[in-house]
């Protein structure tokens, strides 16, 4: 684990006065290290784009869903190897494990192909994230 405890890290990322009220995504709080949790808390929107922490090796699909209309699996076109990424915009697609149907449009780290990442793999506090453009 990192140099700081969870409480100390919250104070650094969220500001000492607001650390107690800092909202952490459930995925980040339970399944990542303190360092990636800090990244998760650093999501922001700028010019309609999202910059946010995400699951390592998250799959990028050709369309915003896991399956095609005929029931076959959707094609994985690339992956996000990094744990902090750029997302151009969002769309509504198939429901996923995050309890919604928001998918973020981005390009991958392996081949540079564009596609969609399920919001469950992006450490936003709400979906769609405020300030991010709809595709």
Residue ranges: model-predicted function:
Residues 1-51:
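N-terminal prepro-regions of secreted/extracellular proteins
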Residues 47, 51-56, 76, 85-92:
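A structural signal for short, hydrophobic beta-strand segments that form beta-sheets
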Residues 53, 61-63, 81, 107:
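A structural detector for beta-sheet-dominated domains
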Residues 57-70:
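Short, structured beta-strand/loop micro-motifs enriched in basic residues and often containing a Trp
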Residues 34-48, 104-135:
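Boundary regions of SH3-family modules and the immediately adjacent low-complexity/disordered segments
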Residues 78-124:
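SH3/SH3-like beta-barrel superfamily modules
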Residues 67-81:
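SH3/SH3-like (including bacterial SH3b) beta-barrel domains
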